[in-house]
C-alpha cells in the first residue's frame, strides 16, 4: 500500500500538470496549438513501444527483486538500459522520416505546418530521452520498489523546472512557440542524467514481498 501511494500521487500530479501545460500551449496562438496537437499525435503513435517497455521493465524488475537475485537485477537493468536507448534512437528515426508525409495529410495552413515540423524535430530529440528515462524511472526504479523517488523526481522536474520556465517563456518573455514547446519537453532530456545515476547505483532495490 505504501509503495502504491506515491504512484497514485504521481499520476494525479501528472494529470494536473497536463492541464497547466494546456494553458501554456494556449498562449502559442491558433497555429501553435494546432501544430502542437499534430506533433503530439504523431509522437504518441511512434512511441507506443517505448511506453510499453516501461510496463515490461517494471514487471521484470519486480520479479527479479522478489527473487532476491541481485546479480539478475543488475544484469537485467544494464541490458534493459541498452534496449531503451536502441528503441529511442529507432523511434526518433521513424519520427524524423515520417514527419513531412504525415503533416502534409493534415489540412493545415503553411504556418501551422511549419510549426508542426519544428515541433516534431524537437520531439525527435526528446524521444530518445523519453525512451530511456521513462522506463528507467517508472519501470526499473519503480519496479524495484523505490516509488517515493519516482514521485519526488516528477514533482521537482515538472513543477519546479518545466512548468515555471515554460510559463515565463509564454507569458512573460513571449518567446517564439518553438522555445516554449522545447521547454515543455526539456525534462525528458534532463531526467536522463538522474536516471543514469539512480539506476546504476542500485540503491532503489526494495523487497516489497514477504
Mark where each language-model region is.
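Hydrophobic faces of transmembrane alpha-helices in multi-pass small-molecule transporters and flippases
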Residues: 1-20, 24, 45, 49, ...
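Short alpha-helical transmembrane segments in multi-pass integral membrane proteins
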Residues: 1-5, 61-127, 169-210
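Transmembrane alpha-helix boundary and packing residues in multipass membrane permease domains
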Residues: 7, 11, 19, 23, ...
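Hydrophobic positions within alpha-helical transmembrane segments of bacterial inner-membrane proteins
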Residues: 12, 16, 88-96, 131, ...
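Helix-terminus/linker motif at the lipid-water interface of multi-pass membrane proteins
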Residues: 12-45, 63-67, 101-110, 172
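Small-residue-rich hydrophobic transmembrane alpha-helices
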Residues: 22, 35-99, 131-150
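Membrane-helix interface segments
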Residues: 31-32, 147-148, 176-177
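Short runs within selected transmembrane alpha-helices of multi-pass transporters and secretion channels
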Residues: 50-54, 123-143, 149-158, 165, ...
Amino acid at each position: 500500500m505504501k509503495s502504491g501511494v506515491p504512484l497514485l500521487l504521481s499520476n494525479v500530479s501528472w494529470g494536473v500538470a497536463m492541464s497547466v501545460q494546456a494553458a501554456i500551449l494556449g498562449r502559442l496562438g491558433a497555429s501553435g496549438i494546432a501544430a502542437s496537437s499534430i506533433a503530439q499525435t504523431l509522437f504518441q503513435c511512434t512511441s507506443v513501444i517505448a511506453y510499453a517497455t516501461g510496463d515490461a521493465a517494471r514487471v521484470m524488475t519486480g520479479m527479479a527483486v522478489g527473487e532476491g537475485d541481485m546479480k539478475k537485477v543488475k544484469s537485467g537493468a544494464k541490458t534493459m538500459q541498452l534496449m531503451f536507448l536502441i528503441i529511442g534512437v529507432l523511434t526518433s528515426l521513424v519520427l524524423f522520416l515520417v514527419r513531412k508525409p504525415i503533416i502534409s495529410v493534415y489540412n493545415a495552413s503553411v504556418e501551422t505546418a511549419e510549426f508542426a515540423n519544428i515541433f516534431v524535430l524537437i520531439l525527435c530529440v526528446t524521444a530518445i530521452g523519453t525512451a530511456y528515462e521513462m522506463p528507467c524511472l517508472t519501470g526499473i526504479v519503480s519496479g524495484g520498489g523505490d516509488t517515493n523517488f519516482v514521485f519526488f523526481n516528477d514533482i521537482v522536474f515538472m513543477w519546479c523546472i518545466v512548468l515555471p520556465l515554460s510559463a515565463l517563456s509564454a507569458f512573460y518573455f513571449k518567446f517564439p512557440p518553438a522555445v516554449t514547446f522545447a521547454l515543455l519537453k526539456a525534462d525528458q532530456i534532463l531526467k536522463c542524467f538522474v536516471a543514469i545515476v539512480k539506476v546504476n547505483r542500485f540503491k532503489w532495490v526494495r523487497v516489497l514481498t514477504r
